[in-house]
């Protein structure tokens, strides 16, 4: 059973929004009492419980805007609110529910927004976390549905029964429509009604669907028969197709060796072309190699006469010499960089020493200033403290320590004086506080005595009022007693007259007559049943005749249907009308059409073979043209890539000219270095121009020399660029030479392509004529083919028609035989249906008489019940008479108790007056003592503050002096004068070392320049050696190329190109013959394929392909639909019966509880009982209607039930609503034992309040054994609280000084109340 454990509220209505405003309440079993004044926030607790469980805002809150704390109160733009609730679900596991809301103020408009709703699963009661989940969020699931599931009750019960809002608490006496909605929601009738409507709708749809399926199955059966015929024809065509395919495979096998040999011949042709291309390439390379050899021979100044190995050795020796010179250059550069690094390091060292020297001088100045400031501060502080100084501290600095110790001793003395004053002040203050505490204790005792006396007076006063009311009631009951005796006499007279008016003998005679009439009808019913049994014995033979007749009518209809369907086709296929042997006549027509089509097909196939031969020739020509055009396009693209738009011969000549020019430029650059050096040498000897011999000034000569030197330095790069350009141009020239065969091939293709295209044009003309003639033949085949297909499609119906005619004749004969077997005594005018109708009529009369008998018996029973009720009323009146007499007997004791209470109240009033007179002087004395204590304490504090201020200034000055003394001692330890002298010596040594290093750098630089000049002079020799090596390599390459050309000539001679070409022509003729034969077979195969495809397409149509499956499926669906209709009818009846039974049982239980609670609680005598009346709405009693109910609350007055709405007082309305809610909670909330009552005493008088308390106490005692039972009562009536029995604690709701709602738990005891924070 689920229950509530705790609730936390923040930012709801008058509850504050800040963290310290959070209010919590822990609910206890069996009763949780919440007490508070009007408007302090009691009802807000119920609203929060309801909102946490259902997510619905309370009524009148403007969709939640006034439910959250108003932001206008504290001048905020938005307010966040949160409700946290911890519960135990119906399985006992702990669940935490948290709902967060926000109200924002934008442009003076308020908007409410739900921020988040979360369920957290806690562990508890032996339950693990639910399905390994920690929490559920409102973004992923419906939180309200989940909470209803956890609590074990529906949302309607939570809203309307368990946590009903005070404004909606009187809903049981609301208007009829709203009351019906509430009860339907509580019973869950709405969902069940939806299920019933769904079942009714499904049953109707199934019945309509059954009619449609029964009509459609005839068409499905016809398609199944058509499918079987077409499948047989398809299998014959496929067997013929397989035979032709085998012949085609034989042709392909004959062509395979021919094709293989043709592939080999093409490979030989490819090899010949490849060797020819290689030969052209080798010739080109050989010629280029010779040209390069001649060019290099001209460039070399000094040819090398040895071998290539000797030349490599010479180059290696030269490289060794150059390597030694480079190594020496690297060593000199390394030494120079090492010396430079040493110089830089020495300069950095000198800079570091300079910085240290400056820092030492600054510290020395700071030391002198610190010592001067220390002496000044010490002298001033000693004068302030009156400490004498006997020596000069400048000349004797060692005396400084003694002076500082004297200062420290004087400061400690001042601190001791302040401590003594503080102790004296505290002692005086404690004595004054003792006096104040004594006065306060005396005052508290007096006030507590007054409070206790007032409480005792109040309780006595309440008891006195209660006794007065009881005495008045007993005095007035004397008159009631007389009325009661009169009423008892009246009831006795009514009972006696009712007994006389009932004639039991007459009633028994009427019942006997009814029973005799029922017996006569039963005899007639039995006679009719025997007649039906006789007809039933003949029913089989009659039924067979009827079935035969129906079958005969069906066959005649089928014959008429088939004849009507094909009446137009009969006129088209037959010249004369036919009446029998339809299938045989149709087969004759079919064979005639087949022979005609076969003749036309043979002519068409002959023409098709011609067409295919032309088509093959055309495809071969197109293939050759495409291949030649592709080769032409590729060759032209290759030529374009190499030559662009320039003619090939012009480009070849231009490339050759460019190579010659580049070779000349390369040679000129190689020789220009020696020429420039010669010019420079001459200008050094005589400053004049080497060309015009013009005398130049020294500056002009120097500029020209520099310019020529720069040109010499650029020569290696210029030579490298010239060599790259020359090699690139040579490669281009070689590529152009390789392009020569492609040029020749393009010319050949351009000559042969027009011839091929002309041949293709002639073949296409012949192909067009052949296609036209073939199409004409195919068109002629169309009409007989259509007629043959029509005859073929009608063949099945003709078989059915012949079969139907035979069946019709057979059924006519069988029907005549069966009619002759019927007996002569059989009366055909008397049908079984008439007897069955008469039997039903007698059965209804029997049922009517039985109902009349039952109503008569019920009337007798009602009369007896009326007598019993009168007897019960008489007994209850006598019980009440006895109770009133007992009250009259206790009247003297009550009056005596009232007099004692009045005298006690007088005594207590005088004692309270005396105690209040003593309290005022005690308050004045206490206030005077407190003021005197505060005045003296303030004066002492001011004096002490002055002393402390002076002491703190002494302490600060002493701290500064100690700091200066510490700094002076630290400076003395550094010995700064000697440090400055050492740094001066180090700086002078570093400067001397730097001068030596600069001299070494100058020497090494000159040596490096000499080595660089020697290296540049060796480059000319290196170039000559490399040219000799390149010449040797080219000579070897030329010899190899010459050998390769000879080998290619020999290979081309070995390939017999003429015999290969002749063999290719013969094989091509053989292949063409086989292709023609294969074409003929393919033509036949195509025709058969068209038939197969046509049949396959027809079979693959959904109506034929799925015909068998659809036929079976249709039968299954019809049977299943019938069963579904029967099952849905049974399900609907079962569900409605269960609903009616559930509703009646629950309403009976609810009304029983309502009567029981009303008699316990209500103390009036005008209403005997109340109950919820259920009225069934009248509707047509069809299978597709469901029952609905209306609800109303009625009251019984003088044994007459009248509607309570509009006929009861405000108190009766409240009490009736409360009792109905109690009964509903007892009935429907078996899984949740929580019930909240908000202000249950509203509009109730004291008697009904007391009886309500007694009833609630009884409910609590009965349910106390259930640990999860919880009754939450919210009230402002403290007398109601005191009447609820043993309440050990309750929760008080009040407003604090900020007008925010606060919840405190109050322990209720006999003499004290303590507030305990939650």
Curated annotation (Swiss-Prot):
Main location: nucleus
PROSITE patterns found in the cross-reference section: ZN_HOOK (PS51131)
Cellular compartment(s): Nucleus; Chromosome; Chromosome, Telomere
GO MF terms held by the record: ATP binding; ATP hydrolysis activity; double-stranded DNA binding; double-stranded telomeric DNA binding; G-quadruplex DNA binding; metal ion binding; single-stranded telomeric DNA binding
Keywords: ATP-binding, Cell cycle, Chromosome, Coiled coil, DNA damage, DNA repair, Hydrolase, Magnesium, Meiosis, Metal-binding, Nucleotide-binding, Nucleus, Telomere, Zinc
Enzyme nomenclature, EC number: 3.6.-.-
Residues annotated for Mg(2+) binding in this entry: 43, 166
Reactions mediated catalytically: ATP + H2O = ADP + phosphate + H(+)
Chain positions covered by the region annotation Disordered: 447-466
Amino acid composition bias (Basic and acidic residues), ranges on this chain: 454-466
Null allele phenotype: Death during pupal stage, possibly due to the accumulation of DNA DSBs and the induction of apoptosis in third instar larvae.
Chain positions recorded as ATP binding sites: 13, 38-39, 41-44, 68, 70, 166
Domain comment, as recorded: The zinc-hook, which separates the large intramolecular coiled coil regions, contains 2 Cys residues that coordinate one molecule of zinc with the help of the 2 Cys residues of the zinc-hook of another RAD50 molecule, thereby forming a V-shaped homodimer. The two heads of the homodimer, which constitute the ATP-binding domain, interact with the MRE11 homodimer.
Family: Belongs to the SMC family. RAD50 subfamily.
Stated name of the protein: DNA repair protein RAD50
């Amino acid at each position: 059973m689920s229950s509530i454990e705790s609730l936390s509220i923040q930012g709801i209505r008058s509850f504050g929004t800040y963290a310290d405003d959070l209010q919590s309440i822990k609910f206890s079993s069996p009763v949780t009492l919440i007490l508070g004044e009007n408007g302090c926030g009691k009802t807000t607790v119920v609203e929060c419980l309801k909102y946490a469980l259902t997510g619905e805002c309370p009524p009148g809150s403007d969709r939640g805007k006034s439910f959250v704390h108003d932001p206008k109160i504290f001048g905020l733009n938005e307010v966040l609110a949160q409700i946290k609730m911890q519960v135990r679900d119906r399985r006992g596991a702990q669940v935490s529910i948290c709902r967060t809301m926000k109200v924002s103020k934008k442009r003076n408009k308020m908007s409410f927004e739900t921020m988040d709703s979360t369920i957290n699963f806690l562990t508890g009661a032996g339950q693990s976390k639910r399905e390994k989940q920690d929490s559920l969020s409102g973004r992923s699931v419906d939180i309200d549905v989940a909470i209803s599931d956890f609590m074990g009750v529906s949302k309607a019960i939570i809203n309307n029964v368990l946590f009903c809002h005070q404004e909606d608490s009187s809903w049981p006496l609301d208007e009829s429509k709203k009351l019906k909605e509430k009860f339907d929601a509580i019973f869950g009738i709405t969902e069940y009604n939806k299920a019933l409507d769904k079942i009714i709708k499904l049953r109707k749809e199934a019945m309509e669907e059954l009619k449609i399926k029964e009509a459609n199955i005839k068409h499905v059966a016809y398609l199944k028969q058509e499918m079987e015929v077409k499948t047989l024809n398809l299998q014959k065509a496929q067997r013929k197709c397989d035979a032709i395919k085998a012949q085609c495979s034989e042709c392909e096998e004959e062509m395979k060796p021919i094709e293989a040999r043709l592939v080999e011949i093409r490979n030989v042709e490819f090899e010949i072309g490849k060797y020819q291309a290689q030969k052209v390439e080798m010739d080109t390379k050989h010629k280029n190699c010779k040209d390069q050899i001649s060019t290099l021979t001209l460039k070399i100044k000094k040819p090398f006469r040895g071998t290539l190995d000797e030349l490599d050795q010479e180059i290696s020796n030269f490289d060794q010499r150059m390597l030694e010179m480079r190594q020496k250059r690297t060593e000199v550069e390394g030494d120079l960089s090492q010396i430079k690094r040493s110089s830089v390091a020495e300069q950095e060292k000198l800079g570091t020493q300079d910085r240290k020297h400056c820092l030492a001088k600054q510290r020395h100045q700071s030391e002198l200033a610190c010592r001067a400031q220390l002496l000044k501060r010490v002298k001033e502080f000693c004068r302030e403290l009156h400490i004498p100084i006997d020596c000069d501290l400048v000349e004797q600095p060692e005396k400084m320590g003694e002076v500082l110790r004297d200062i420290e001793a004087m400061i400690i003395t001042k601190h001791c004086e302040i401590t003594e004053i503080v102790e004296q002040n505290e002692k005086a203050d404690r004595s004054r506080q003792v006096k104040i505490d004594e006065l306060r204790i005396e005052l508290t005792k007096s006030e507590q005595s007054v409070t206790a006396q007032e409480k005792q007076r109040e309780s006595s006063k309440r008891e006195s009022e209660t006794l007065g009311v009881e005495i008045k009631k007993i005095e007035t009951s004397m008159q009631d007693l007389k009325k009661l005796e009169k009423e008892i006499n009246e009831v006795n007279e009514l009972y006696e007259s009712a007994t006389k008016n009932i004639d039991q003998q007459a009633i028994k005679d009427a019942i006997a007559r009814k029973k005799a009439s029922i017996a006569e009808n039963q005899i007639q019913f039995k006679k009719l049943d025997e007649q039906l049994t006789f007809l039933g014995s003949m029913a089989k033979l009659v039924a067979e005749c009827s079935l035969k007749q129906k079958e005969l009518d069906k066959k005649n209809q089928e014959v008429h249907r088939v004849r009507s369907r094909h009446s137009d086709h009969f006129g088209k296929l037959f010249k004369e009308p036919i009446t029998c042997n339809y299938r045989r006549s149709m087969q004759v027509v079919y064979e005639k059409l087949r022979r005609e089509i076969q003749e036309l097909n043979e002519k068409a196939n002959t023409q098709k073979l011609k067409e295919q031969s032309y088509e093959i020739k055309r495809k071969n020509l197109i293939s050759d043209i495409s291949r030649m055009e592709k080769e032409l396009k590729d060759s032209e693209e290759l030529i374009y890539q190499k030559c662009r738009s320039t003619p090939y011969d012009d480009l070849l000549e231009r490339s050759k000219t460019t190579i010659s020019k580049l070779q000349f430029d390369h040679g000129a650059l190689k020789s220009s270095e020696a020429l420039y050096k010669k010019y420079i040498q001459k200008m050094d000897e005589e400053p004049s121009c080497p060309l015009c011999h013009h005398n130049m000034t020294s500056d002009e000569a120097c500029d020209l020399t520099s310019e020529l030197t720069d040109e010499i330095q650029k020569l290696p790069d210029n030579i490298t660029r010239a060599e790259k350009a020359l090699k690139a141009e040579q490669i281009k020239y070689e590529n152009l030479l390789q392009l020569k065969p492609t040029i020749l091939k393009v010319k050949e293709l351009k000559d042969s392509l027009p011839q091929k295209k002309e041949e293709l044009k002639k073949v296409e003309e012949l192909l067009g004529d052949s296609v036209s003639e073939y199409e004409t033949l195919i068109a002629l085949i169309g009409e007989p083919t259509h007629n043959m297909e029509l005859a073929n499609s009608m063949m099945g119906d003709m078989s059915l028609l012949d079969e139907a005619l035979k069946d019709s004749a057979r059924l006519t004969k069988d029907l005549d035989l069966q009619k002759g077997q019927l007996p002569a005594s059989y009366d055909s005018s008397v049908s079984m249906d008439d007897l069955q109708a008469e039997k039903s009529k007698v059965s209804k009369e029997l049922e009517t008489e039985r109902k009349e008998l039952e109503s008569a018996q019920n009337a007798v029973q009602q009369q007896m019940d009326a007598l019993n009720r009168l007897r019960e009323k008489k007994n209850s009146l006598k019980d009440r008479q006895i109770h009133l007499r007992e009250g009259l007997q206790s009247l003297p004791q009550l009056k005596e108790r009232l007099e004692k209470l009045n005298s006690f109240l007088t005594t207590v009033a005088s004692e309270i007056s005396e105690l209040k007179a003593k309290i005022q002087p005690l308050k004045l004395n206490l206030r005077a003592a407190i003021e005197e204590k505060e005045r003296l304490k303030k004066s002492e504090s001011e004096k002490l503050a002055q002393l402390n201020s002076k002491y703190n200034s002494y302490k600060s000055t002493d701290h500064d002096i100690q700091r200066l003394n510490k700094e002076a001692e630290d400076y003395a330890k550094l010995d700064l004068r000697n440090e400055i002298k050492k740094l001066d010596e180090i700086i002078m040594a570093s400067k001397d070392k730097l001068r030596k290093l600069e001299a070494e750098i100058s020497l090494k630089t000159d040596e490096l320049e000499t080595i660089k000049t020697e290296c540049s002079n060796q480059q000319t020799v290196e170039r000559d050696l490399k040219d000799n090596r390149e010449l040797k390599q080219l000579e070897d390459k030329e010899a190899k190329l010459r050998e390769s050309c000879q080998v290619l000539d020999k290979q081309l001679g070995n390939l017999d190109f003429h015999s290969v070409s002749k063999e290719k022509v013969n094989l091509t003729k053989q292949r063409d013959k086989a292709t023609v034969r294969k074409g003929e077979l393919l033509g036949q195969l195509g025709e058969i394929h068209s038939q197969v495809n046509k049949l396959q397409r027809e079979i693959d149509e959904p109506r034929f392909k799925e015909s068998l499956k659809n036929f079976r499926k249709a039968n299954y669906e019809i049977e299943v639909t019938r069963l579904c209709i029967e099952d849905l009818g049974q399900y609907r009846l079962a569900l409605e019966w269960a609903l009616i039974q559930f509703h009646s049982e629950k309403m009976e239980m609810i009304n029983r509880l309502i009567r029981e609670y009303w008699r316990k609680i209500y103390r009036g005598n005008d209403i005997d009982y109340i109950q919820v009346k259920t009225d069934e709405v009248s509707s047509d009693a069809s299978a597709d209607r469901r029952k609905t109910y209306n609800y109303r609350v009625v009251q019984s007055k003088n044994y007459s039930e009248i509607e309570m709405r509009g006929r009861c007082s405000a108190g009766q309305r409240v009490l009736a609503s409360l009792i109905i809610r109690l009964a509903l909670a007892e009935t429907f909330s078996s899984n949740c034992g929580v019930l909240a009552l908000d202000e249950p005493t509203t509009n109730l008088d004291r008697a009904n309040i007391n009886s309500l308390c007694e009833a609630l106490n009884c409910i609590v005692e009965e349910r106390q054994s259930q640990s999860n039972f919880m009754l939450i009562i919210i009230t402002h009536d403290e007398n109601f609280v005191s009447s609820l029995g043993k309440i050990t604690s309750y929760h008080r709701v009040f407003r604090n000084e900020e007008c925010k709602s606060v919840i405190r738990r109050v322990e209720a005891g006999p003499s004290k109340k303590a507030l305990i924070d939650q």
